[in-house]
């Protein structure tokens, strides 16, 4: 690239926060869903969303240039295939991801990235004076946004996990930190002889029943509330931790894995689903972005294979890994 091209590329990177907020605003207003039945004018959309029509038009025009919408005659807008991913109820929807990453708490925490870089501590508690869990317990709207994002991301990830690992010889599976059970339900639906245990904090699993009932797996799924740092359900064959370990520093990660190791049956195993920093291929921006996100939010991190081997009396060592498709 010449100097002008380099400047253009750097400009694009630095301006990214503006694009995020523009996408967030139209998603928060429900514009993509209003276009499910076909094109509509910005005046119609503004009237339905109680927005200022000229300002909404300017944002839609920007997002049209970014490839999320098309603009026809009389300023009538329609979604493109990429823009359709902002809609609810569609395959691969990223609606709740956008609402999460555009939400005010996420912006405040990333705005304090300098604090984390200078101190090595998560900026979340620096900004709010609370852990993420304490903050969401006191802010129901923020909790709802986060929970919807997690459910959506698990729904998008579950098919790849089910396809990547053969649970046919597994008799029992404990999903540690399994939330409301979306991933476990998907696994149980695929493997009809498998018995599962959903384990998470009591207030989290208290809301799992509707999803498990819709999946028709309640007869093969026990729901247990508790604190995994103290103990996990004992005497099961396999323990699954999906995107749990990356929340924590090495000390806490070892504690969680040790609890599972102590609880599992002889010859049992612990399965981890994590973003991995793969040292044998080009670095992948989404993984590295998630790594920095763990820094500011939780004090955790994404790890390489080698970093998943912790020294200690129980020799916590990573076994073979499987890379899920993009």
Task: Give the predicted meaning of each segment.
Residues 317-326:
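Conserved S-adenosyl-L-methionine
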